[in-house]
């Protein structure tokens, strides 16, 4: 089954073709992402109306490009998957409208996919994928969650952020220190030049019971350190390193506790922050110490993309799950309400 996947929940337009007749990573026939970073840079954040308009301009050309790279014609598609939520309502409607129109014209089934389920399942596209049960750390600009995965479509929320998501904290901290948009990746690169231990910030909520997170206090602590410093380039790098170390250690500690609570030793990491090199190394070490595995998607599939939507949609389409023939999106959507596959 060849499934066309469309992602348009925020500021990236993603399209992919996933072929269930192929094995492992080869099943991803083609994928392409158009980023709107340059469009939103002057505003310091995503402008929803501009995001929607840019999806309108870019989506169909990206569909044509992806099909060409896969060596397929539009008539070779057996199903269409699209992000139905959560996300920006206007951006979601663009992707849903194109997807439903293609499915109707081709007379093939379509299914709306939960954006975070797409992220959660992205590591399963790689060779030697993990098998449920496992714990997933979903860590991005909009979400920081620990989820127990009992089976595909059977999810239990173990903990989540009470304020800023980890990726949001990266972005806001970078902005406070004058780094260009988008700040998170810039801050991570800057941290490579920092000296560990020069600045040591709190590891939020690790001394409390439960698996929830909080990063707003850490962000304030970094702001105060930056304001009181000489604000030199080396100091900026040292503060960035101290901040990154605090976030990575906090996430690692909570992940280990989540594994114990769920009774497994397999951790799956997905979302934009999942591309962070230091986080990957730390969780890999933790999993090996526990005799388990840490599984990640390739870095290109950590950020928003159509591949994860095509894959998650293929699983549901193969299970006979289709969405009603109407353009409908869910900007706020609890993943625990999803049906099992």
UniProtKB/Swiss-Prot annotation:
Presence of keyword Cytoplasm: yes
Annotated residues for binding of substrate: 138-142, 171, 184, 276
Cofactor, free-text remark: Binds 1 Fe(2+) ion per subunit.
A molecular function GO annotation: iron ion binding
Residues annotated to bind Fe cation: 115, 119, 304
E.C. number(s) listed in UniProt: 2.3.1.234
Localization, UniProt: Cytoplasm
Cofactor(s) the protein needs: Fe(2+)
Classification via Pfam families: TsaD
GO cellular component: cytoplasm
NCBIfam families according to UniProt: gcp_kae1, T6A_TsaD_YgjD
UniProt record similarity statement: Belongs to the KAE1 / TsaD family.
Function: Required for the formation of a threonylcarbamoyl group on adenosine at position 37 (t(6)A37) in tRNAs that read codons beginning with adenine. Is involved in the transfer of the threonylcarbamoyl moiety of threonylcarbamoyl-AMP (TC-AMP) to the N6 group of A37, together with TsaE and TsaB. TsaD likely plays a direct catalytic role in this reaction.
Name of the protein this chain belongs to: tRNA N6-adenosine threonylcarbamoyltransferase
Gene: tsaD
